[in-house]
Amino acid sequence: MAEDDAEKAFFQAQAMNADSVDYKAVEDQGASSDSDDYDPSKTLQDQYSASILDSKQSEIAPSSASPSDPNPPTQSIPPETDPSQPADSAYPSQTPSRADSQASVSAPASGTSVPLKTRTIGGFVVEDEDEDDAGDADYEPPAVLGVEDMNTISMNVPQQPISGNANEDTPTPDVSMDGAVQASADAKNFPNSSYTPASAAASKSDTPALLSQDMYNSRTLQSENMQDSAAATPVPDSPSTSKGRLPHDRVGILEDRIQEDPRGDIPAWLELINEHRNRNRIDSAREVYERFLTAFPFSAEQWVAYATMESELNELYRLEQIFNRTLLTIPDVQLWTVYLDYVRRRNPLTTDTTGQSRRIISSAYDLALQYVGVDKDSGSIWTDYVQFIRSGPGNVGGSGWQDQQKMDLLRKAYQKAICVPTQAVNNLWKEYDQFEMGLNKLTGRKFLQEQSPAYMTARSSYTELQNITRDLNRTTLPRLPPVLGSDGDIEFGQQVDIWKRWIKWEKGDPLVLKEEDQAAFKARVIYVYKQALMALRFLPEIWFEAAEFCFLNDMENEGNEFLKNGIEANPESCLLAFKRADRLEITSESEQDPIKRGAKVREPYDKLLNALYDLIAKARTRESQDVARLEETFAKINPDTQPSKTDDDDDDQSDSKARESMKNAQIEALRNAHAIQIGILSKTVSFAWIALMRAMRRIQGKGKPGEMPGSRQVFADARKRGRITSDVYIASALIEYHCYKDPAATKIFERGAKLFPEDENFALEYLKHLIDINDVINARAVFEMTVRKLASNPENVHKTKPIFAFLHEYESRYGDLVQVINLENRMRELFPEDPTLEQFAHRYSSPAFDPTVVRPIISPSQTRPKTAFPTEQPVSRHGTPSSRYPDASVTNSPKRPLEDFDDEMNRPRKFIRADSPLKTTQRRQLDPPKRTQQVISNQTGSQFRSQGSPAPLPRDIVYLLSIIPSASAYNAGRFSPEKLVDLIRRIDMPTSISQIPLPPSVRGLGFPEMSICLWGRLPSTTWPKTVHPCGKPTFIALSSITRVKCKRFTGWRSPYIRKPSLPPYGTYSPSLAFLISV
């Protein structure tokens, strides 16, 4: 059925005489019975609102051919062509008569310009439909598929192509439904596709069909002679209805994806190329390759695929053109490998009798190693180069001149290869070792010894580089940086970090080239920058760093080239545009004419502003598309029907209102989300204008009317173009005041106050300006007006806080106290959560000092240092002595251990009997932990049982504690470890080994033998800080002693000292220090 429709469409196209047909005749033909059999709208799957009824209705009230020309033309207008291409240009796959077959009926283009209405806002003359207010008005696109559109659909039957490639297949018949105007120079053989090239789309931008695709146009075309059309009602164009693609129209769908997102949807590009190649459409594949490589000129992978395709097709001339365009600008190992294969293919060595082919191949290898020989993956090229030299005439080790020449070439190649950190450096070194030792062992050792440091450096550097780039994805298909929090942001950040570490590693000069070969060092750094920019093409900071490195190393041309390419890749980048403008401003100081110099400096700013304004337009278009898609979704879910009066009830009305409110809420949320993005772009545009304004002020001053633009002309251009924030007015006013003391600054602030009445930042800067010119009365008036307007809206109350804070600071310093108190009262009413102390202290404080929080030192007791250990409370010496023997109820007998019951109610009933006397042997063999429990229970009372000590004490210490009396029984002075530690802390310790007196006795190799004597009742945490007073204490750090003979103790009699971990004989521990007796 589809073939029958296409055949009918073909006959209809043949019946239409393109030279003499007019729109009236077309309408009559559309109303005839023959044309009723084929209706293009039937193939659109109800995506367009136009119907056959509309086309029949147009017979009664025909519409004009053009909005600006009510009289229809008497003959068809030929399709517009791309001005960038010659008129007779056509791809080899197209026949000369194809353009005639496609020129069925074309919609006329409107060539007249429509003036825009102007109005005055805040004293400035602005356009009526400026972009600042364009979003508030509803856009009404022209009719979709009206009478003209229904009858001007081009119906093309592709003919058999005449191509240089005999293997192209014959395309299937097609009926195009996209537009009425198609450029004959750009027509392609797309089966089942309605693709229109970008050049053709640009050439028909004045037609109503294309205007219907842009819902938020920045300028609404108006014409006084425009007549009302009764053909069809304008219907908003949605993304789904703007194309009308069939499901099997794979090429058209991919083209739509590319047109919507050319820089972000790289998979669509690659799928489209594969689709053409699978269909054996080589010319179409070439065209897509050229478009892709125009957008991504440094994508080496696709250049390699493009060159491989031409090589497989034996298109050697096209292949050479690719090499001429890429080899010197794209340093890629794989691309150069393809080139070397091509050179060896065109210059066979088997039939080379003159040696010309060998010389050509050798020069090709030299050129390749010059450009990509420093790459860490270039080991294959170095290996092939060495093998190529080995295969040359002559014998290694011979005495002839050819033999000597071959030996010299091999030695030179090996010595270059082993200095580069590549994956083949180890194998090349082994081969070089065998080569030198095979010639002459004596001279070979000399050469190897000379080249060994370079080889060791290259080998270790390659290992380091592999560790850095282990997780690196060395792709040349650039990716737009994902927004933080979006899909892929972590992976992209990891790749960026790896590239930056590689660049930092190269700048660190691991191969030690900076001192010996400065040019080689710079070349390696520039090479890695170029490699990084292939993958990070859309990251402006890498372009900036590369250009800055070139400028710092006297490489002006390379730096400018980096900036130029970076701006081409990122035209919306303020960083690169500002850097480029600064370089132009610095390098053009010798230019005497300020107008020419200003034009040169302004060029990067203009490119930046154009790109930003285009982004704003695309954002508005995307917003309209999203809103239309949302409305279409709700329309499909809830179709608009007209119910009868009998079916109306309260439930239906409530459901309808609920659905409408839900739709409006989602649309409002969608618009708010887009408004945030557009607001950021508007802010960026404003600061770009500010940067341009300041640059022009430095070059041309404030300007003169009719003579020199200057900063004032930039301010006028910014206001005329729109989409600026209050920052532009603030910057212009402050330039006028600080640079020229011109009263125009106040006028600019006054006009800005009318345009931005709710901008708190502008109001704050306005107040500061009035205070600077000592106009306090107007400053207070502006303050009251701004605060009253903002406070009237509860949502804007928070915006008044910085304004209150500024005036409060001014009044507290230079105003009246009554004014200050009144301001504080108003601030308490508006901001009750702010503490009163903070408001009061703000009067007397500065950013560097606050006197209200200062606490002066009155007494030395306020600065008493903290003790290292808390002071223990003294124990009463006259307490009641406890019983010598423990309570029988808790005594743990060694014959029958004490049972532990948590529940006192379930304890078994026992009888108390007298304790049997323990023998001495049994007492000594008593379990130490249990004995400890008995002693502690004896001291603390029989009503408590021990919960267990952190660590068990030695058995001898437990026995000692069991036989000595309690400490409360002694009335003599007690040992205070805290005071002793404090005394040691105040002792001047030696800081070097020379201050330590050596002991008189020296044994062995001169190392002192020390005996460690420990005593005292110290907590274990203070070890080893005290000694028995049997000699002069001396402090020796073990870090200054290489050999220490330590005495191991077998018995300890101190109840509070645990045996430390002493180092064995002949070792030392730098972290320990001992107090010893000499």
UniProtKB/Swiss-Prot annotation:
One MF term in the entry's GO annotations? mRNA binding
Q: Where are the HAT repeats?
A: 280-312, 314-345, 356-391, 405-438, 475-508, 520-552
Give residue spans, biased composition: Polar residues. Answer: 42-55, 82-115, 151-170, 190-206, 879-894, 931-949
Query: Does Nucleus show up as a keyword for this record?
Result: yes
Mention any one GO cellular component term assigned to this protein in its UniProt record.
Answer: cytoplasm
Q: What is its main location?
A: nucleus
Q: Pfam families, from UniProt?
A: Suf
What UniProt keywords apply to this chain's record, in alphabetical order? Cytoplasm, mRNA processing, Nucleus, Repeat
Compositionally skewed regions (Low complexity) per UniProt:
58-68
Q: What segments bear the compositional bias annotation Acidic residues?
A: 126-139
GO BP annotations, alphabetical order: mRNA 3'-end processing
* Region (Disordered) residue spans: 15-209, 222-251, 632-663, 851-950
Q: Which domain of life is it from?
A: Eukaryota
Q: Where in the cell is it found?
A: Nucleus; Cytoplasm
The residues that cross the membrane are: none
Q: Where is the composition biased (Basic and acidic residues)?
A: 896-907
UniProt cross-references to InterPro entries, sorted A to Z:
HAT (IPR003107), Rna14-like (IPR045243), Suf (IPR008847), TPR-like_helical_dom_sf (IPR011990)
Instruction: Report if keyword Cytoplasm is assigned.
Output: yes
Q: Which PANTHER family match?
A: CLEAVAGE STIMULATION FACTOR SUBUNIT 3 (PTHR19980:SF0), RNA CLEAVAGE STIMULATION FACTOR (PTHR19980)
Function of this protein? Component of the cleavage factor IA (CFIA) complex, which is involved in the endonucleolytic cleavage during polyadenylation-dependent pre-mRNA 3'-end formation.
Q: State the protein's name.
A: mRNA 3'-end-processing protein rna14
What is the protein's species of origin? Aspergillus oryzae (strain ATCC 42149 / RIB 40) (Yellow koji mold)
Q: Which gene encodes it?
A: rna14
